[in-house]
Amino acid sequence: MALARAASGQAVTLVPPDGPLAAQTAALVKADQFEAIHLVVPEGREIAEHAVEGPITLFCLEGEAEIGLPDGRVTLAAGQWLYLDGGVPHSVYGTRASRLLLTIVLLAAPGT
């Protein structure tokens, strides 16, 4: 079941009480100030190291993922939340099949 983009004021079920779970990464909303993404990381899959300009948060909805950081790795299990400053290089590895809620703060370009 694919997740559709959310409209302002619309409730979205990210963790259904039963039935099939969303199995693919999908942008939930992208506004001028932030973007929210339902991120699916299969077991054994790695998202290579990268960085984004603005701060991010990762909330583990299901499974377990390792976040690679310059100073080591942090394990996120279901129910755990992580904040990263903008520009921090990081990778994501699915130690178990995982679903994460990724929020990215979008910084305005200078002069806009």
Regions found by a protein language model. Name each.
Residues 47-49, 67-68, 84, 89-95:
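Short beta-strand His + acidic residue motifs that chelate non-heme Fe in jelly-roll/DSBH
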Residues 64-66, 73, 89, 99:
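Structural motif
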Residues 22, 35-52:
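Conserved short histidine dyad/triad with adjacent acidic residue
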Residues 61-62, 77-78, 96:
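A cytosolic small-molecule/anion-sensing beta-strand core signal
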Residues 40-42, 52-66:
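Short, conserved beta-strand element in jelly-roll/cupin
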Residues 86-110:
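Ligand-binding loop in jelly-roll beta-barrel domains
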